[in-house]
Amino acid sequence: MVAIKRLATVDADFKAQMDALLAFEAAQDEGIERTVIGILADVKARGDAAVVEYSNKFDRLTASSMADLELSKAEMQKALDGLPADQRQALEAAAHRVRVYHEKQRMEGWSYTEADGTMLGQMITPLDRVGLYVPGGKAAYPSSVLMNAIPAKVAGVKELIMVVPTPGGEHNQLVLAAACLAGVDRVFTIGGAQAVGALAYGTEAVPQVDKIVGPGNAYVACAKRRVFGIVGIDMIAGPSEILVVADGSSDPDWVAMDLFSQAEHDELAQSILICTDAAYIDRVQASIEKLLPTMPRREVIETSLTNRGALILVRDLEEACAIANRVAPEHLELSLADPDPWVAKIHHAGAIFIGHYTSESLGDYCAGPNHVLPTSGSARFSSPLGVYDFQKRTSLIKVSKAGAQTLGKIASTLAHGEGLPAHAKSAEFRLEN
């Protein structure tokens, strides 16, 4: 029997139990940190030569130059053309839905003119160049290519450079096909901290980017943290999370499988059920026991559920929503008979999946909204990846001669108050009297 925690809000120590359940902090491995610092410094100093050397070492390659580590657009197109029909159709359908959704996020500029002729506004411009990191090998995720690349292209990013390691020289054709569909401009078959360094600093072959997005292992995450400030980054993602709020009206097998869908990612993933019905919680646990033996990744799922999962009994749905807001999960399912009135009660979640038929996996692949979501409670202050992450806002100020008289006096007074006389004079020189 899976030893998943059973909690109840009526328990005297419920708060302490919740604190323990949610206590997760990504470990900082000093060995990884030292390795990454060394690799980044080497790439910054030696450029292509360092990238080739590390790629050969870590990915078991025999590249002699960066020319051996760049794929052409023809190779991306070949990967797309070579897909089985069902895979190509699914990839194209997902790409279309992701593009349609994200086109609605595009920010537009605005301005207004005051009575004295002064114009104020905001201009929206895309980033010039973005780097997309994609994990390599057999476990590569083409859906991540679509979710990261399409919003960038919708935003108007001029050049999108993808880096993807190819251990043993193995190319994932689905990933390359997704890159082709999403409009990726260049692909380098490099990975790890050396790829992050190449994107952040630029080398002879790899242009420096303005922002790096995409998931990666501990070395990649560490490297992204280290180069932040030189370039922008999307986020440092923690383990996957799902929280299901249920009232007992949905098939318990569905809920159990939804919990599995995140637990199968890795042992640190977190799957939580919050329910108003104790008997239904029992049925979900029975479904877990029944379905787990059928899962190829059952050991990972069981470890995840045992270490970080929970089945929580609450008094009512108001209490369920309050707990959900405290958790601020990456994925939140409202598995309720009448879910719509409860959506407004949720203030903190990466994405909300509403109703019995909205499985979290649809959001992962093809519903349309982005699957790059805030984790580890950061949905309290963060948002999903979107077009706005690839656009910048620039303030516009055009002061008329009349406006300079009014604003100049205000600015002069405030500047003198702050002890900045040159600021004051800059405004005063434009005053008529």
From Swiss-Prot:
It catalyses: L-histidinol + 2 NAD(+) + H2O = L-histidine + 2 NADH + 3 H(+). Binds 1 zinc ion per subunit. PROSITE patterns: HISOL_DEHYDROGENASE (PS00611). The active site is at residues 330-331. The keyword DNA-binding does not apply. GO terms for biological process: L-histidine biosynthetic process. The keyword Aminoacyl-tRNA synthetase does not apply. InterPro entries: Ald_DH/histidinol_DH (IPR016161), Histidinol_DH_CS (IPR001692), Histidinol_DH_monofunct (IPR022695), Hstdl_DH (IPR012131). GO terms for molecular function: histidinol dehydrogenase activity; NAD binding; zinc ion binding. This is Histidinol dehydrogenase. The lineage of its organism: Bacteria, Pseudomonadati, Pseudomonadota, Betaproteobacteria, Rhodocyclales.
